[in-house]
A protein has these predicted regions:
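Structured interaction patches on ligand/partner-binding surfaces of diverse proteins
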Residues: 76-78, 102-149, 212, 246-274
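C-terminal motif of bacterial Sec signal peptides marking the signal peptidase cleavage site
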Residues: 20-23
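Short strand-edge motifs at loop-to-beta-strand transitions and within beta-strands
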Residues: 81-83, 149-153
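Bacterial N-terminal signal peptides that target proteins for export
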Residues: 2-12
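Intrinsically disordered, low-complexity repeat and linker tracts
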Residues: 4, 25-34, 273-297
Length: 297
């Protein structure tokens, strides 16, 4: 989805800039015979622009009683944008999830989702996830005084992303490990402690990290995608194993700030300064919240 900053009376296009969850534009399709509600997906995080959208699932719920009004499945964001929903007057909440393909799943995929508060996004296998899924929640009030409504729904990544970099390691060192307290699932329609949609479960799961071989003096993992830290925990915990070329096994227990929904993080360490137990704070070198380095325009 590419950024566009305006649309005309005949063609409205996707906006790829952050916007308010409750934003709603009127009269976008004035002059057209068909009226109703249309949904425009946008990127909440500018860093996600350019991500291919392969699959979109959309649910519209009655915000007053939580009942399901519409459930749709699309192949692209453009298909979503072209759909119009003829809805009676009322208050509605909209959930969109993109790229919800293996290993991602939602609650009870064999039947329709009928309860707004119980929707879950999970992973059939949390190890070595190659792509992210994205979700967005917004609401709209329909009063039928205007014939056409366009609601913009910003989507953000479900999983946190972590990159581990260790400098000055002996060449041939192998790194493996696991994240100990990633959430088992995410409730996309419930708000977290920051007041944002996306509440991690209380139930944890361990996420095994792929084994990486240091071919040079710097060992760098690929992006590790995992569920955010469990609900209520102020910290995340990472267990690392380094197998040196001489067969020595070294183990490290690392405590770092909690990983949030859609967060992007970098753990950078110097092998010569590593200790069996390390407590990293957000204010010191070693743990970097990459979200703070992404310019939001």
């Amino acid at each position: 989805m590419k950024a566009k900053r305006r649309f005309n009376i005949w063609l409205w296009v996707l906006l790829c800039v952050p916007c308010l969850l409750a934003s709603c534009d009127h009269n976008v399709h004035d002059g057209e015979e068909e009226s109703g509600l249309s949904v425009s997906l946008t990127w909440a995080d500018e860093a996600d622009q350019g991500t291919e959208v392969k699959d979109v699932k959309l649910w519209i719920f009655n915000a007053d009683d939580g009942s399901l009004v519409e459930e749709k499945h699309y192949g692209s964001a453009q298909e979503v944008a072209s759909q119009r929903f003829a809805l009676p007057e009322g208050h509605y909440q909209i959930l969109a999830i993109t790229n919800l393909i293996e290993p991602f799943f939602t609650t009870d995929q064999t039947r329709a989702l009928t309860n707004w508060n119980n929707i879950q996004i999970g992973l059939t296998n949390p190890k070595d996830v190659k792509h992210n899924a994205y979700f967005g929640v917004t609401d709209v009030r329909i009063d039928n005084k205007e014939g056409n409504y366009v609601v913009q729904n910003p989507v953000k990544s479900v999983l946190a992303e972590l990159t581990i970099i260790i400098e000055n390691v002996p060449k041939g060192t192998e790194m493996s490990g696991k994240a100990l307290d990633a959430a088992w699932c995410l409730f996309p329609t419930q708000k977290n402690s920051d007041g944002e949609y996306g509440l991690p479960s209380i139930k944890p799961t361990e996420v095994e990290m792929p084994t990486i071989l240091a071919t040079e003096s710097t060992l760098q993992s690929e992006v590790i995608r995992l569920m955010p830290t469990i609900q209520g925990s102020p910290a995340s915990h990472v267990y690392l194993r380094l197998l040196l070329p001489n067969g020595t096994l070294q183990e490290y227990d690392i405590t770092a700030p909690a990983m949030k929904v859609g967060g992007k993080y970098e753990l950078r360490l110097n092998y010569n300064q590593m200790q069996p137990k390390m407590n990293l704070e957000a204010t010191i070198n070693g743990w970097t919240n990459l979200n703070n380095e992404v310019e939001i325009k």
